[in-house]
UniProtKB/Swiss-Prot annotation:
Originating gene: calcrl
Span of the signal peptide: 1-33
Membrane topology type: Multi-pass membrane protein
Disulfide pattern: 63-89, 80-120, 103-142
Topological domain spans for side Extracellular: 34-154, 214-224, 289-304, 367-381
Family: Belongs to the G-protein coupled receptor 2 family.
Membrane-spanning residues: 155-179, 191-213, 225-253, 268-288, 305-329, 345-366, 382-402
GO molecular-function terms, A-Z: adrenomedullin receptor activity; calcitonin gene-related peptide receptor activity; calcitonin receptor activity
Protein name, UniProt field: Calcitonin gene-related peptide type 1 receptor
Residues carrying a glycan: 81, 133, 138
Gene3D superfamilies reported for this sequence: GPCR, family 2, extracellular hormone receptor domain (4.10.1240.10), Rhodopsin 7-helix transmembrane proteins (1.20.1070.10)
GO cellular component: plasma membrane
InterPro entries assigned to the protein according to its UniProt record, in alphabetical order: GPCR_2 (IPR050332), GPCR_2-like_7TM (IPR017981), GPCR_2_calcitonin_rcpt_fam (IPR003287), GPCR_2_CGRP1_rcpt (IPR003289), GPCR_2_extracell_dom_sf (IPR036445), GPCR_2_extracellular_dom (IPR001879), GPCR_2_secretin-like (IPR000832), GPCR_2_secretin-like_CS (IPR017983)
Amino acid sequence: METLQMGLLSRSALFKYIIIFLIMINTRGYVLASQEQEAKTSVPEERQVGVTQNKIMTAQYECYQKIMQEPAHGKEGQFCNRTWDGWLCWGDVAAGIISEQRCPDYFQDFDPSEKVTKECGKNGHWFRHPDSNRTWTNYTRCNTFTHEKVKTALNLYYLTIIGHGLSIASLLISLGIFFYFKNLSCQRITLHKNLFFSFVCNSIITIISLSAVANNQALVATNPVICKISQFIHLYLMGCNYFWMLCEGIYLHTLIVVAVFAEKQHLMWYYLLGWGFPLIPACIHAVARSLYYNDNCWISSETHLLYIIHGPICAALLVNLFFLLNIVRVLITKLKVTHQAESNLYMKAVRATLILVPLLGIEFVLFPWKPEGRIAEEIYDYVMHILMHYQGLLVATIFCFFNGEVQAVLKRHWNQYRIQFGSFAHSEGLRSASYTVSSISEIQGTTYTHDYSEHSNGKNCHDMENVFFKTEKQYM
């Protein structure tokens, strides 16, 4: 019995030695091949080759273990023996059958969603290529669409850069308008400024991350701490975007639904929510990522740890949606007896925020359901990139450029500019008439803002909330 056990142990040890020997042979071949190109290979390429070698050697070791440990083919008839083709492991296959499996991820130009095929001939032997007369596996589909995918990736990259560039330009113009025209200053506009500034910062860090980190394989390979810090800042600022949107919803809800406390609003709480709270999920994600999924530069999206960031954002969007729907309910029931102009003024502000919430949140609704198939996946990528990277432009357009107050102020100052610099100097009568019309339109356009002025935190606020205090008195 002892002799039998010794024999079994020796046999097991022998199998292990055979596996190690085969791996050493392949490793030596890889090392010799890489040494021939050493003078021409850069450090990042060597690192990539090393990663590829490790993946192949691991797959080879597991394949040889599987070959020796699995029971023999027990079915009748001819079949092709299990084998390792150099990249993938193939089990026993009945004669006349074409076996297939996913493409490996060893190489950057290989698409793991495509299929590899290996044909077992009717004679029970693996297919041999007619040119080389050697057993052959069909890997051609793995990189058939590589050129198209590289082209798509470049298009998405430029689409992203252009989107954030347009967002930065439009947001800076909007901030310039809000800061230059002092009669627009009020608490609501202050919230707009912070929201816009968070989007500007997010767009800047995104462009830096894409151009200096994601597009720089050498930097990703070295995995410096600075690239992880940039990813941390990026995720933090992304959270700030959505929590400042929540601040917009809370402010409107407090102003309209809880109007009794409207004069007691303190912006400090909004600053803590908009700039402070997103630090919590960002820090938790950073710690969890470093412990459980510490990939290079934290750029991989193939981890559920991202829900640490996305979860609070989705919660903020849902809360905001509830606030805005409640605001609409209050406006419909409370403002029926007020003037139509005042009701419309409120509805415009609420409508702007109500439109933005689903538009900014749809990416997190669609994120888990990425479709399968090359064309469907490509369409999905384009739609998601537009929704994600043109948000700043969308926010600036809805909250500033389409804002009636902003348009009225710009139009008034433009008319004053034309009059001041003699746009109608060719006719004294026309200039006088134009000045009269401009003055009348100015008075009419500012009746709403100048009739009810509010002093909030020492600032004269010509804003729609002034109207609300007047309408509230009708219910008291």
